[in-house]
């Protein structure tokens, strides 16, 4: 996040998606999903605390008005999924890799005879 690695991903999302809506604030100032560094794997005792601390992230997500939320990694996907479920946010969460896969040209493999 802090080294600008997501800039290339943003370029791709802008190319691949019809209407990309950036969260505000964004980039290195974006609010954390609360699952960073694998914190989500600390388990149920910490989930309640994570959800209380995720209220602003929930509001940030809702302000976009988007239908789909793109998660850059598995930890973020799980953290965002928890937020969406806990607060009843009507939004689908997809992995960035799934977005790429959806728009890829696919050929069906057929064994040569």
Language-model segment annotations:
Residues 1-113:
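Iron-sulfur cluster-binding electron-transfer modules in prokaryotic oxidoreductases
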